[in-house]
Amino acid sequence: MRKATLDRNTAETKIHLELHVDGKGKYEISTGIRFFDHMLELFTRHGAFDVTLRCEGDLDVDQHHTVEDVGIALGQAFTQALGSKMGILRAGYFVMPMDETLAVAAVDLSGRSAYAVDTKVKVRIVGDLQTELVDDFFEGFSRGALANVHIKVMYGRSNHHKIEASFKAFARALRFACAKDKRLAKVLPSTKGLL
């Protein structure tokens, strides 16, 4: 069972996270930022991951610590749950339409952190979320998971749809990267010998 339980406590946030990689898209999520919760719910459903997440952050200061730390913790949970990464596909990509918006995501669970995100969001706030923090979430995940994360919105009108399509595409790309390949069950997907 590819599962992880993680508690991450700092002076800025207190996070409890439970992850089941091979889940059914069930979630219980509370970060104190409703639009962010909604995006994380979409992430779990489209990735078919089961996630329980509670975060108490210093939202009276700013949303940054909450959003970034959730990304870091989620990335760390995937690293923990996947263990040696033996037999996984390692990389995945997905092209996600969301009405008039199209987003592309690619993920490589390479053991190296790198990210590039272009959501083309043109407003400061969507719902109750500071939109610049979308990048911080994906960067945090990349750092926590030691993964390459690339997301690009190709086009779209609605800023809500641009963010939503990004989270959905990311979830589905990550789902493929985590998938097992029975032919390579005892093979590490790297010529270096480690990830």
From Swiss-Prot:
CDD domains: IGPD. It is an enzyme of class 4 (lyase). InterPro entries: IGPD_sf, ImidazoleglycerolP_deHydtase, ImidazoleglycerP_deHydtase_CS, Ribosomal_Su5_D2-typ_SF. It is found in: Cytoplasm. GO terms for cellular component: cytoplasm. Pathway: Amino-acid biosynthesis; L-histidine biosynthesis; L-histidine from 5-phospho-alpha-D-ribose 1-diphosphate: step 6/9. The keyword Lyase applies. It catalyses: D-erythro-1-(imidazol-4-yl)glycerol 3-phosphate = 3-(imidazol-4-yl)-2-oxopropyl phosphate + H2O. GO terms for biological process: L-histidine biosynthetic process. Keywords: Amino-acid biosynthesis, Cytoplasm, Histidine biosynthesis, Lyase. Belongs to the imidazoleglycerol-phosphate dehydratase family. PANTHER family: IMIDAZOLEGLYCEROL-PHOSPHATE DEHYDRATASE, IMIDAZOLEGLYCEROL-PHOSPHATE DEHYDRATASE HIS7. This is Imidazoleglycerol-phosphate dehydratase. The gene is hisB.
